[in-house]
Amino acid sequence: MTPAPFGRSRGGECCPGITLLELVIIVAIVATLAGICIPAYDKYRNNTRIAQAILDIRTIEHDLLIQEGFNGNFPDDLSEVGKGDLRDPWGNYYQYYNTATKKSKGHGGGQRWDKLAKPLNTDFDLYSMGRDGKSKPKLDAKESLDDIVRGLNGQYLGLASEF
């Protein structure tokens, strides 16, 4: 018995396989699913990073409040509470500003302002510059919208765009 030529069965009919049209349809379905899943996954990852930054800021805030309880004032630098080299989930240093002494050594920005040009906090400012790694003093600036900020002396902690 001789083998059948390539692509043909012994009866002269074609072997079952995938046509070019079927392959194009499969590729289109996979591309559509990827187009839906990748942005959803990116949003999930960003929300996870925001939650981690909020947790980090609460932890640093707790350490700063303990320091203030012992010394009667807040430190001028996060390294005084052992958090000077702590980075946010996007790889940037957390920003700290002591509003009482108007000082910020190391990784610190200036005082932050809300959309009505009022100071965010009266004790200290502590925030992450967010996903873009940029920030401006006013929360409604484009560079500040993704910042994770502490406001109202700790009563608010979340995205600057939602403050």
Model-derived segments and spans:
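Short, surface-exposed interaction loops/tails
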Residues: 2-6, 62, 102-163
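N-terminal single-pass transmembrane signal-anchor helix
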Residues: 14-45
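Short, ordered coil/turn segments that flank beta-strands lining enzyme active or ligand-binding pockets
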Residues: 15, 89, 131
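N-terminal leader/signal peptides at the extreme start of proteins
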Residues: 1-16
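A generic fold-level signal
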Residues: 15, 52, 118-121
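Extracellular/periplasmic head regions of type IV pilus-like filament subunits
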Residues: 59-116, 120-122, 163
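Aliphatic-rich helix starts adjacent to a transmembrane/signal segment
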Residues: 40-57
